[in-house]
């Protein structure tokens, strides 16, 4: 019994679909509660004020407000959402 497939066959030719990761709402943008801010693998961006983190590390807004990207320590970044009446 032959264990080699004949000519004209390749073991390549597969790829995974793009996962559409990245920042979805930018600094200064108004968002509503539940809006997805960042889709990511791991915590490239950490959750800040009024931002929650999902099981797949997605960051989402907990309140209506404006998006702000901030530094957290020396080399970490965080995303916060502040209500309209708070000065940034």
Curated annotation (Swiss-Prot):
InterPro entries for this protein: Ribosomal_bL27, Ribosomal_bL27_CS
Keyword annotations: Ribonucleoprotein, Ribosomal protein
GO biological process, one term: translation
The UniProt record lists the keyword 4Fe-4S: no
Gene3D superfamilies documented for this protein: 2.40.50.100
UniProt GO MF annotations: structural constituent of ribosome
Any one of the GO CC terms: cytosolic large ribosomal subunit
Alphabetical list of PROSITE patterns matching this protein: RIBOSOMAL_L27
KW GTP-binding (keyword) present: no
SUPFAM superfamilies in the record: Ribosomal L27 protein-like
Protein family per UniProt: Belongs to the bacterial ribosomal protein bL27 family.
Stated name of the protein: Large ribosomal subunit protein bL27
Species of origin: Carboxydothermus hydrogenoformans (strain ATCC BAA-161 / DSM 6008 / Z-2901)
